[in-house]
Amino acid sequence: MEQLNNIESIYVQNATMEHRKQYAQFFTPLAIAQLMADWLLGNDKMETVLEPAFGLGVFSRILLSIKSNLLIKGFDIDEMILHEAKKHFEGCKSMKLMLQDYMFNDWNNKYDGIICNPPYFKFHDYDNKSVISEIERKLSCKLNGFTNLYTL
C-alpha cells in the first residue's frame, strides 16, 4: 500500500509547506490508517464516529469503504483542507463536516468511536490560548506548556 493516496498527494503538491506547517499537517500513511480503522470496527456495534482532526478524511474514507452506514462527524480548522475533503464526500449523507475547532465543540455528544491523528504542536505554540483554559476547566486539571494534542 502506498504512503499517500492520490488525494493527499495532490494536496501536498498544491498547498505550500508554510500552510501545512501552520496547521501541523502530516498525513497518516494508508497502512496505519487501515490498521486503526480495522481496530475501531472491531466493535460490532460501531454506529457513530468522531474524526476530530479531519484533514482529508483518510480514516473516514477507509471506514466508509468497509461499513457504509456509519455516521461520521469530522472537524477541522483549516478551510483549505476541509474544502478539498468535502469534494470527496459530496453526496455522502452519513458524513457531517464542520469548519470548527473540535476543542470548543461537541463536548456533550457521545460517539461509539473516535479516530484521528491530531496535529502535532505543543500548546506553547498554539495561538488560541483560551482553548487551554477551557480544556483545563472541563477536565478539572492543569496542563503544562509542553502538553500536545496527543495527550488529550
For each predicted feature, which ranges?
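The conserved SAM/SAH-binding core of class I Rossmann-like methyltransferase domains
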Residues: 75
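Conserved hydrophobic residues forming the short capping helix/wall of the S-adenosyl-L-methionine
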Residues: 89
